[in-house]
Amino acid sequence: MKKILMWLTVLTLMLTGAAFADQENAPVMLVKLPEDAQMVENVAFDDGDFIQTYQLSGGAYVQLLRYAQGDVTLDGIVAGDWPGATDIQSMALETVGGYAAKGLMLSVEPEDEEAVRVALVLVSADRCALVYQAVYPQRLGDDQIDDAVQRMVDSMDVLGGSAAKDVG
């Protein structure tokens, strides 16, 4: 009985180690943020998910997220995080770092809050979903917002994952 328990413990540790090793090699999205960006949140979860939030000038912020399950969709993000979104427009985006990507720009006027313009980019990388979410107060104007978002989207890349290995 002791040998069985010992082998079960060893097997559990091996599987746990393999899971953590897989997370370390999981892809992450790289984005060149404006110089004034300040990280205000950096949370990693045991399942491989993570959230990084950066505060920008003018009340804007950017979030970089990784979901270990790749079943995340832009429609799901909009429905869950931005109900009542209007003026939803697709971005001209097909790949980021060799992985399939899609993007949306949308407007949201939350009740009792300032209207915002939101940019979302979803990259399907290996078994993960990488998400870029930029939120700008609408008062900054569409031209300034679109320019800032376009510069960040143009700088996007993916570090790690199988597509990066194949490019070599």
Residue ranges and their predicted role:
Residues 79-126:
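Signature of long, low-cysteine stretches enriched in small and polar/charged residues
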Residues 33-36, 56-59, 97-99, 122-129:
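Short, solvent-exposed coil/turn segments at beta-strand boundaries
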Residues 36-40, 85-88, 101, 156:
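Short glycine-aromatic motifs
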Residues 1-4:
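Positively charged n-region of N-terminal signal peptides that target proteins for export
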Residues 27-76, 109-114:
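Secretory pathway targeting signatures of secreted, lumenal, and periplasmic proteins
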Residues 15-27:
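Sec-dependent signal peptide cleavage junction
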Residues 8-16:
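Bacterial N-terminal signal peptides
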